[in-house]
Regions:
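Serine-dependent protease modules
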Residues: 3-7, 24-311, 320, 358, ...
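Hydrophobic membrane-insertion alpha-helices, especially the h-region
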Residues: 9-22
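A structural signal for beta-strand boundary/capping segments at domain termini and interdomain linkers
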Residues: 140, 385-387
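Conserved PDZ fold ligand-binding element
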Residues: 118-119, 324-359
Length: 438
């Protein structure tokens, strides 16, 4: 009896210690992982080919009665994409001659129109000019990469050779602005090379800023979901229960590279806005303001003497030569003589729309503005409201950004410091702090 009592006490103590750790730990160890699958670990897959066509945002009110009906409706519009690129870090000996190695990876995509255009993620077709597209009936077609946008992680291919327009069924795009948290969603793709895999979940949240390690900028207005998506799902559709694409699965937060309940999709409105220009021009110019900043904290409100319910985005830094600098926006500064810190401007509204966090500004610019458009900024400066107008420029290349811009970043809400994690083979690592610069 005495041993049992001691044993029970030890178990109780362990549970108490674990509970305290869970309640007090505020660090979430995560890594942003693209969902591209190296073909060396892919299972054998037997993909099918489409049969209809439409593109652009759908406003259909007809509802599909069941998940099997949704899958049957769209399965012929979802494809597997196989891309092969040279690997300069690998040398193989073939017939006694050293040659650069090649790596092959698998991703997903879906039919955009009956002209044979396929949309997928940029990271699925990065570094290649051609790829193979396999439908669920097993038919494989060669396709040329006709457009890429690393900033939004979008890529467009076009099937070459003969194909039947009647059999290429485009997937209708829903209006992602109308999506609500809690809605049921369906993900279809080729996780681990298992073609035509369907998983379900809900919209966990919308309007997320998704850090993009390839560019240093963020993907705006991303949809968060708990539908299971894994390596190989990259570029596949996230669907509503009508069988319309509300987004494109692109990444997960995970410490292992495997699904852990938090996935992200590029919204369908971004696809609808960009893809026609990617087909036409091969690239897309993102509008850019050139600031970094963050939500006003209660401590700052108290220190500056603002009303307790004050809302807005405080500017941390302004990029030299940016539209923000030309418009006269001021960031956080420090007096070299006495070391005093001067608070930056506080943006309270853009084009008359109130803003509460940097996400609001970035999402508005990305969804509503184009390069060359003017944007009106309502700014609180030294206790007074001023109106400034900025003319948006094309977003610069990452390499041309100053180091201060790359470093002056904020963490995603609710996440503690992101530690350095070992890189998972085949997947890019997440920068320590995700960028929040429009």
């Amino acid at each position: 009896m005495k041993f049992k009592a001691v044993y029970a006490l030890l178990i109780s103590s362990f549970i108490l210690m674990l509970s305290v750790y869970i309640l007090t730990s505020n660090t979430l160890y995560v890594q942003l992982v693209h969902l591209l699958l190296p073909s060396s670990i892919a299972a054998q897959s037997q993909p099918t080919l489409p049969s209809q066509s439409t593109s652009s945002l759908s406003s259909s009110s007809s509802s599909v009665s069941s998940l099997p009906d949704v899958f049957q409706k769209v399965e012929n519009s979802v494809v597997q994409i196989t891309s092969t690129k040279s690997n300069p870090n690998e040398v193989i000996i073939l017939n006694g001659v050293p040659q650069t190695g090649r790596s092959t990876a698998l991703g997903s995509g879906f039919v955009y129109d009956n002209q044979g255009h396929i949309v997928t993620n940029y990271h699925v077709v990065s570094g290649v000019k051609k790829a193979d597209v396999t439908f669920t009936d097993g038919n494989t077609y060669s396709a040329n990469v006709v457009g890429k946008d690393p900033n939004s992680d979008l890529g467009v291919l076009q099937i070459t050779g003969d194909f039947s327009e009647e059999k290429v069924v485009s997937l209708p795009l829903a209006n992602s602005s109308a999506v609500r948290p809690g809605e049921q969603v369906i993900a279809i793709g080729n996780p681990f090379g298992l073609s035509g895999t369907i998983t379900t979940g809900i919209v966990s949240q919308k309007g997320r800023l998704l850090p993009n390690p390839d560019t240093g900028f963020s993907i705006s207005d991303a949809i968060q979901t708990d539908a299971a998506i894994n390596p190989g799902n990259s570029g596949g559709p996230l669907l509503n229960t009508k069988g319309e694409a509300i987004g494109m699965n692109t990444a997960i937060f995970s410490s292992t590279g495997i699904y852990s309940g938090v996935g992200f999709a590029v919204p369908s409105n971004t696809i609808a806005k960009e893809v026609p220009l990617l087909i036409k021009n091969g690239s897309y110019a993102h509008p850019w303001l050139g600031v970094s900043g963050g939500k006003i904290s209660p401590d700052l409100i108290k220190a500056v003497g603002l009303p307790t319910n004050y809302k807005g985005v405080i500017i941390g830094s302004v990029q030299p030569g940016s539209p923000a600098e030309k418009a006269g926006l001021k960031g956080l500064t420090q007096d070299n003589d006495n070391g005093a810190t001067h608070t930056g401007d506080i943006i309270t509204a853009v084009d008359g729309h109130p803003v509460r966090q940097i996400d609001d500004i970035i999402n508005y610019i990305e969804s509503q503005k184009n390069v060359g458009d003017n944007i009106k900024l309502t700014v609180s400066r030294d206790g007074k409201l001023v109106e400034l107008t900025a003319t948006l420029q094309a977003r610069p290349q990452t390499s041309s950004l100053s180091s201060s811009q790359n470093q002056d970043q904020l963490q995603p809400p609710g996440l503690g410091p992101i530690p350095e994690l070992p890189q998972i083979p085949g997947f890019p690592p997440l920068p320590r702090l995700p960028p929040l610069l429009p």
